[in-house]
Each structure stands twice: as structure tokens, then as C-alpha cells.
Amino acid sequence: MIVGILTVDLSVPGSNSLKDKRQVIKSLLTLIRNKFNVSAAEIDHLDSHRRAELAFACVSNDQALVNKMLDKILDFIRSNPLCEVVDSDLQFV
């Protein structure tokens, strides 16, 4: 069994309040959960209105499949005009 964990550090430059940031992040997490069927959560910078750290987990018996899925998620996030990827990390367990 392969577990892939993707963490993504984001900047939300258009956000002027926590409410603005949460709207962007909640929408992004919902879209990703529905499109890719992965576990997703905001894990850090909860009280910052311009930063967010998200984590995604995918389980499979094929590491190539997990890697491909998490790469697609990262590309999807990068294509979102409301946030910018500052850093990302991919780990396999």
C-alpha cells in the first residue's frame, strides 16, 4: 500500500480578511475533493488572511498512480488565479 501526501503552501494575495481567504480555500478544497476523490484539509496558517497550507492524501497500491494524481492536483491549484503556490512537498509513506 502506498500513501502519497502532498502539502502546498499558498499565498492568497487578493484576500483582505480571514473570511475572504476561507471562501477561496473552502472552494478550492471542495473542487479538489470532488474532482480527484482525495482527502484534503487546511493544516496551517489558519489565522493568517494571506497564507494557507493545504494537505492532500491519496492511497493506492501503485506509486505511479499516486504520484500522477498528486501532480494533477498541484497543477490544478497552480491554474487557480485566486492563489499562488509558494512551496510544495510530496512524500510517500
List each language-model region with its residue ranges:
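Short, charge-patterned binding micro-sites
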Residues: 3, 41-62, 91
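Beta-strand elements of well-folded, non-transmembrane domains
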Residues: 10-14, 34, 60
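A structural boundary/capping signal
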Residues: 11, 37, 73-75
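Amphipathic alpha-helical assembly/interaction segments
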Residues: 31-33, 37-44, 67
